[in-house]
């Protein structure tokens, strides 16, 4: 039997549609912005708008949200570790090959100063943590520049 007979394709969920694994398992992968947007829309109520802001730069997110007093859900790498090209699998829905970028993590971008961005990060009870701007922007790009914003709808009287 040739070795090609032993190779099997791995299939898995699309992180744009599902959480890959369990949020309670350290070995799980995670999910991407559309999943968080959809979950928030189900629970947040009619007075807020939830927007997938994937593709926006950190500067654009700061201007649109932070400067207006609203935090933004922000994808980067856990503890700003280097991104690592992770495992690949075929998506169950499409058969397309997907490559996970390991060290994926999302947290809440809450502020900035001249040199740093500030995040509320639940990982290991980090609390409010500061990272250098250049590192943050690099890690955000590595995770496909994903973000989710939430704003209160304006009521016209």
Predicted regions and their residues:
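Extracytoplasmic/secreted envelope proteins and their assembly/folding machinery
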Residues: 33, 37-41, 59, 63, ...
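Extracytoplasmic
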Residues: 69, 102-104
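Noncatalytic regulatory segments and standalone regulatory/sensor domains
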Residues: 82, 86-101, 110-157
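Short, small-residue-biased leader/transition segments that mark boundaries at the very start
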Residues: 1-7
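...with weaker cross-activation on analogous glycine-rich loops/strands in unrelated enzymes
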Residues: 54-77, 81
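Loop/turn elements at helix/coil->beta-strand transitions in domains of secreted/extracellular proteins
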Residues: 43-47, 67-73, 113-116
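Second-shell loop/turn segments in exported
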Residues: 19-30, 45-53, 62, 95-96, ...
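Structural recognition of the beta-strand scaffold that forms the well-ordered cores
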Residues: 49-51, 71-76, 108, 118-120
